[in-house]
């Protein structure tokens, strides 16, 4: 059985979230995959629509206003995540590409990772290619 990981911010209302739930439930019905969904916030109207076979985990970065505290805590969280999950999955996908934590989770969990692009990112970064590249390279 192949192990798949998907990461997102939450399952709040929206097109990306609805598409993710539909994809996960479709994959779960095939019984070919062990699926894990990492969320930054375990909340949203689609949460109860997720198939019971899908494991839901939380990876929530610290957002303290005290920069040194935030960076220290997040460094520890990232290190612990890497120790536990680095390359443990056959495939991983950051389904919320606007989220650096979701991207980190997917890039760490598998050598075969992808970023689901559901937006026009060059517009988000005012057509500044260096900002665009910096965002996606982490």
Whereabouts are the PLM-identified features?
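Membrane-interface segments of envelope glycosyltransferases acting on lipid-linked substrates or membrane lipids
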Residues: 1-138
């Amino acid at each position: 059985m192949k192990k798949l990981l998907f990461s997102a911010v939450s399952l709040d209302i929206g097109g990306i979230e609805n598409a993710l739930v539909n994809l996960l439930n479709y994959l779960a019905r095939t019984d070919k995959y062990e699926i894990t969904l990492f969320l930054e916030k375990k909340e949203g109207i689609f949460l109860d629509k997720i198939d019971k076979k899908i494991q839901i985990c939380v990876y929530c970065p610290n957002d303290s206003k005290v920069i040194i505290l935030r960076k220290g805590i997040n460094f520890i969280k990232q290190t612990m995540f890497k120790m536990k999950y680095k390359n443990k999955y056959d495939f991983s996908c950051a389904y919320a590409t606007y989220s650096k934590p979701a991207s980190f989770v997917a890039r760490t969990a598998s050598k075969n990772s992808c970023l689901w692009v559901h937006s026009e990112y060059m517009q988000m970064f005012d057509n500044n290619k260096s900002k665009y590249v910096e965002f996606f390279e982490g």
